[in-house]
From Swiss-Prot:
Compartment annotation: Cytoplasm, Cytoskeleton; Cell membrane
GO MF term set: GTPase inhibitor activity; small GTPase binding
Homology family: Belongs to the CDC42SE/SPEC family.
Lipidation (S-palmitoyl cysteine): 10-11
GO biological process, one term: regulation of Rho protein signal transduction
Species this chain originates from: Homo sapiens (Human)
Domain of life assignment: Eukaryota
Stretches assigned to the CRIB domain: 30-43
Main localization category: cytoplasm
Protein name: CDC42 small effector protein 1
Mutagenesis / variant outcome for changing residue 33 to A: Abolishes interaction with CDC42, induces a decrease in blocking CDC42-induced JNK activation but does not affect targeting to the activated TCR
Tissue: Widely expressed. Expressed at higher level in T-lymphocytes, dendritic and whole blood cells.
Phenotypic consequence of residue 38 to A: Abolishes interaction with CDC42, induces a decrease in blocking CDC42-induced JNK activation but does not affect targeting to the activated TCR
InterPro entries per the UniProt record, alphabetical: CRIB_dom, CRIB_dom_sf, SPEC
C-alpha cells in the first residue's frame, strides 16, 4: 500500500498559482485631493527649450516665497 502512495506522489505536481489580475482603476475609486495648495504656474514661455533646466532654481525660489516650508508634505530636497 505504501508503494502505491509513493508512486502517486511522484505524479502529482503542485499547480502554479494563477497570477492575480490587477484591478482597473475607475473614477469612483479616486477621492478629492487633500491638503492641496496651489503655489504657482509654470508655462511653456517660462521654461523655454533653450534654457533647459537653468530656470529650475528661479522657479524653486519663487515657490519657496509662496508659503510655509514647514508643511508635513514639503520636500526639502531640490529638483
Amino acid at each position: 500500500m505504501s508503494e502505491f502512495w509513493h508512486k502517486l506522489g511522484c505524479c502529482v505536481v503542485e499547480k502554479p498559482q494563477p497570477k492575480k489580475k490587477r484591478r482597473r482603476i475607475d473614477r469612483t475609486m479616486i477621492g478629492e485631493p487633500m491638503n492641496f495648495v496651489h503655489l504657482t504656474h509654470i508655462g511653456s514661455g517660462e521654461m523655454g527649450a533653450g534654457d533647459g533646466l537653468a530656470m529650475t532654481g528661479a522657479v524653486q525660489e519663487q515657490m519657496r516665497s509662496k508659503g510655509n516650508r514647514d508643511r508635513p508634505w514639503s520636500n526639502s530636497r531640490g529638483l
